[in-house]
Design a protein with these regions (language model features):
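Structured soluble/peripheral alpha/beta segments that form catalytic or ligand/cofactor-binding pockets
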Residues: 1-282
C-alpha cells in the first residue's frame, strides 16, 4: 500500500438511459514512484474493466499547476486538465486498454481491446468548501468508446473529480455518493470524521451535513440532511456493481441511476469498509 502524498483525477459518465457508462481514474503517488490506473466501461449489461496499481510515476506534482496531466505510457492513458484547479476550462481524456469482461476485479489486462476519448467541459463546481484539496465539477462530456470494433457515442452530463492529500489513502472507511442531472446534483461523503457534502437543486446549493445509507443492495434509499434542516432522499438503483482488491480488502463501487428529491440523476456510489463506519449522530 502506498502511503505518501497522492493526487488523483477521475472522469465519470453515466448516460441518462443507463445503457452506457465510463469511469477513468488516475491516482499518482509521486513520492513513491507509482501510479494507479482504473478504467471501467458499461455497455448495456456488460461491464469491462482494467486496473493496475504498479505503473510508474515521475516525481512531479500535477495538482497545483496552471494545467495538469495525469498519464501513463504503457498502457497509454491520459487525463489532461486545462486551466488551474480553481479555474479549469476543460479536461481531455483518452485511453487504449486491454480490458476484461467481469465485475469482480483483479489487476492486469484482459483480452478485449477498448479505447476511450473525449472532452469534459465544466459547468459548475459543487461544494467548493466541502473538503480541502478536492474538486467536484459537473459538466458536459462529448466522446466515444470503441469496444470490440463498435463505437459508442458519449454525450451528456458528466462529473470530473480531482483530489490531493498528504494522508494515506484507503486506510479509513468511507462511503462516497455522487449524482448529477439536468436540474439536480450532489456529492456526499461519510467517514469516521462525520458526513459532508453539497447538493444542488434547481440552481440553489445547500451543504450536506448528514448522509445515511443502508447496506449494499441493488436498490437503496439514501438519506441526506441539509444544513437548513431539510431532509433529502435519493432512491438509488444499481446498474452494475464493481469490486476491486486493494491490499487484503475490497473496494466496492457501482454505476447507478437515481432520483434525488424527485429529480432524475445518474452517478456512482462507492464504498470502502463501509461496515466499519460509525452510525451518524441523531
Amino acid at each position: 500500500m502506498n502511503r505518501g502524498y497522492s493526487e488523483s483525477a477521475m472522469v465519470m459518465y453515466v448516460a441518462a438511459d443507463g445503457e452506457t457508462a465510463l469511469t477513468l481514474r488516475f491516482c499518482r503517488f509521486p513520492d513513491d514512484g507509482v501510479t494507479w490506473l482504473w478504467c471501467h466501461v458499461l455497455d448495456g449489461d456488460r461491464l469491462f474493466g482494467f486496473t493496475d496499481h504498479d505503473l510508474p510515476c515521475d516525481g512531479a506534482r500535477a495538482f497545483d499547476g496552471p494545467a495538469a496531466a495525469y498519464a501513463t505510457v504503457a498502457p497509454t492513458a491520459l487525463i489532461e486538465r486545462s486551466g488551474s484547479d480553481g479555474a479549469m476550462t476543460e479536461a481531455r481524456f483518452s485511453a487504449g486498454l486491454l480490458m476484461a469482461e467481469r465485475a469482480a476485479g483483479r489487476h492486469g489486462p484482459g483480452d478485449t481491446r477498448v479505447s476511450v476519448n473525449g472532452v469534459f467541459t465544466p459547468r459548475y463546481s459543487l461544494g467548493e468548501a466541502v473538503a480541502e484539496g478536492r474538486r467536484e465539477v459537473v459538466g458536459a462530456l462529448v466522446g466515444e468508446i470503441v469496444l470490440g470494433g463498435r463505437r459508442l457515442r458519449l454525450e451528456g452530463l458528466a462529473k470530473y473529480h480531482e483530489q490531493r492529500q498528504d494522508t494515506p489513502r484507503f486506510i479509513e472507511p468511507f462511503r462516497y455518493l455522487c449524482l448529477w442531472g439536468p436540474t439536480a446534483s450532489c456529492v456526499a461523503i461519510a467517514s469516521r470524521a462525520g458526513q459532508i457534502g453539497a447538493a444542488m437543486l434547481d440552481g440553489a446549493e445547500s451543504v450536506v451535513t448528514r448522509f445515511v445509507a443502508p447496506p449494499i443492495a441493488d436498490a437503496r434509499s439514501v438519506e441526506l440532511g441539509l444544513r437548513d434542516g431539510i431532509g433529502l432522499r435519493a432512491d438509488v438503483r444499481t446498474l452494475k456493481a464493481i469490486s476491486l482488491p486493494i491490499g487484503s480488502e475490497t473496494w466496492r463501487g457501482s454505476f447507478v441511476t437515481a432520483t434525488l428529491g424527485g429529480h432524475a440523476v445518474t452517478g456512482m456510489l462507492n464504498e470502502w469498509q463501509a461496515d466499519r463506519l460509525p452510525p451518524p449522530a441523531s
